[in-house]
């Protein structure tokens, strides 16, 4: 890793403004790093070096003129779920072959308006459906981390695996990601990076390929808490084009870092102690509690009694919304088209060829739970459970809790093509056990690296906050980060 690519966003920002480095130099360093590493990691599916150089040149001109934006000259990777004008946007699916949008997503436009530079589009699970980044049409992403003494390839988590791997391997300064049931926080935990899923409505969904519209939310993956705070400030905005966007001012999240935790109450939910959870995860959780206690926070036990129903309810609601959202991909207007003897045959052949196995599975689950005779038994009941989950959190926060601390994942990163997980999709779905409640309740959640397991792989802790109180999450996560230190993989790629 070069000296330039090892800079955090905050460090690079300072050097760019002081004119110690140029945006062109920084961008070229990342382009070289991607060229050298992407063949092994498969984090990027489309690199845009020419566009990056033009954007970097423009940044240098604005810096020279004293008109630097908040992210001026900072090279970023963009998850392939965000529409980027004239640049490949496929949600890593065969069915969107060759699709290049004529418009820009609100989130990416916000970043460009603040001066960021686009390095390319990042790999992900197809249509964001997966927990390992193995469902991508472009093949799996490889985690930059390896277990001590092992050459086994590990997954980076999903669906934002490309984002997490690129950030961990220093192939971008930071990355955009999305989270429907844990797709920012789980990959962050698996790669020793920081990922925040903001409150539902904090970042616009306009121009972001939809998976489950009532659950999807964009957020950043970054190397540390400060960088995540810087990125979220630029990504977040109110947007008239997204009816779920909330009209609240975007705070200066970075200003929250370093604030005292004295007087804060941190809730510890007993329901997150699940059967089969490794002792290492429990030990890490206790360590996190101790760090926050030392920082002046009061630790209180809380109950979130409907947590056990969250995963089954999520895997009804999310596929139901996905089956509706993905009905639009039919080969008529854009993307893949497989010719048939008539229009119905063309639809069927296009969808059969265009969607991957996991996407088909979830479409079928969703169509089933929305069908006559099952709608009330499954979908309506799942929505009622969702209301109860949200109510559990409301009661905890009403009782004076400021944030909730839990593990981020039930394990560290597992192997690529794990036979046990491939044979039983439910085991793969259990990766989301600690994260789905946050999406079901529309709350903010952040994953922060907190230690290494016995194999030397990163483990993360999760903080859950009140609606639109990301500032509390950032300041609390910063305390954990300061106590735990930062974690970087040994370079093998």
UniProtKB/Swiss-Prot annotation:
Entry-linked InterPro entries: Amidase (IPR000120), Amidase_CS (IPR020556), Amidase_dom (IPR023631), AS_sf (IPR036928), GatA (IPR004412)
Record GO biological process: translation
Alphabetical list of Gene3D superfamilies matching this protein: Amidase signature (AS) domain (3.90.1300.10)
Enzyme class: ligase
MF terms in GO: ATP binding; glutaminyl-tRNA synthase (glutamine-hydrolyzing) activity
Quaternary assembly: Heterotrimer of A, B and C subunits.
Name the UniProt record assigns to this protein: Glutamyl-tRNA(Gln) amidotransferase subunit A
Source taxonomy: Bacteria, Pseudomonadati, Pseudomonadota, Alphaproteobacteria, Hyphomicrobiales
Gene it is expressed from: gatA
């Amino acid at each position: 890793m070069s000296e330039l690519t090892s800079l955090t966003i905050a460090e690079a920002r300072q050097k760019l403004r002081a004119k110690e480095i140029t945006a062109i130099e920084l961008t070229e360093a990342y382009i070289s790093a991607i060229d050298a590493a992407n063949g092994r990691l498969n984090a990027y599916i489309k690199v845009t070096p020419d566009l990056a150089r033009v954007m970097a040149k423009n940044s240098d001109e604005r810096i020279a003129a004293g008109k630097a934006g908040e992210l001026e000259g900072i090279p970023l990777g963009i998850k392939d779920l965000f529409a980027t004008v004239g640049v490949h946007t496929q949600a890593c699916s065969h069915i969107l072959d060759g699709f290049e949008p004529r418009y820009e997503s609100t989130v990416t436009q916000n970043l460009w308006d603040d001066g960021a530079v686009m390095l390319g589009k990042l790999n992900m699970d197809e249509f964001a459906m997966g927990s390992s980044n193995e469902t991508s049409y472009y093949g799996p992403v490889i985690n930059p981390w390896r277990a001590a003494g092992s050459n086994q390839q590990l997954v980076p988590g999903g669906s934002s695996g490309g984002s997490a791997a690129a950030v961990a391997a220093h192939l971008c300064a930071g990355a955009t990601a999305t989270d429907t049931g844990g797709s920012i926080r789980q990959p962050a935990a698996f790669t020793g990076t920081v990922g925040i899923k903001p409150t539902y409505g904090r970042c616009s969904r306009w121009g972001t390929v939809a998976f489950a519209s009532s659950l999807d939310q964009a957020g950043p993956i970054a190397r540390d808490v400060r960088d995540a705070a810087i990125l979220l400030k630029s990504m977040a905005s109110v947007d008239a084009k997204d009816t779920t966007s909330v009209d609240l001012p975007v705070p200066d999240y970075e200003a929250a870092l370093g604030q005292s935790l004295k007087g804060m109450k941190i809730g510890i939910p007993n329901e997150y102690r699940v059967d089969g959870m490794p002792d290492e995860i429990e030990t890490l959780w206790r360590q996190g509690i101790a760090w926050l206690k030392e920082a002046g926070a009061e630790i209180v036990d809380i109950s979130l009694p409907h947590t056990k129903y969250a995963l089954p309810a999520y895997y009804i609601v999310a596929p139901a919304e996905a089956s509706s959202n993905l009905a639009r991909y039919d080969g008529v207007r854009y993307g893949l088209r497989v010719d048939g003897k008539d229009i119905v045959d063309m639809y069927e052949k296009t969808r059969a060829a265009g969607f991957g196995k996991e996407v088909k599975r979830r479409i079928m689950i969703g169509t089933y739970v929305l069908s006559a005779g099952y709608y009330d038994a499954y979908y309506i009941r799942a929505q009622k459970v969702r209301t109860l989950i949200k109510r559990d959190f409301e009661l905890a926060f009403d009782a004076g809790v400021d944030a909730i601390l839990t593990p981020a994942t039930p394990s560290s990163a597992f192997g690529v093509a794990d036979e046990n997980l491939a044979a039983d999709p439910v085991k793969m779905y259990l990766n989301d056990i600690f994260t789905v409640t946050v999406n079901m309740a529309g709350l903010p959640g952040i994953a922060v690296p907190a230690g290494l397991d016995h194999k030397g792989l990163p483990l993360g802790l999760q903080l859950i906050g009140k609606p639109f109180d990301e500032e509390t999450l950032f300041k609390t996560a910063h305390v954990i980060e300061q106590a735990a230190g930062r974690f970087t993989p040994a370079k093998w790629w």
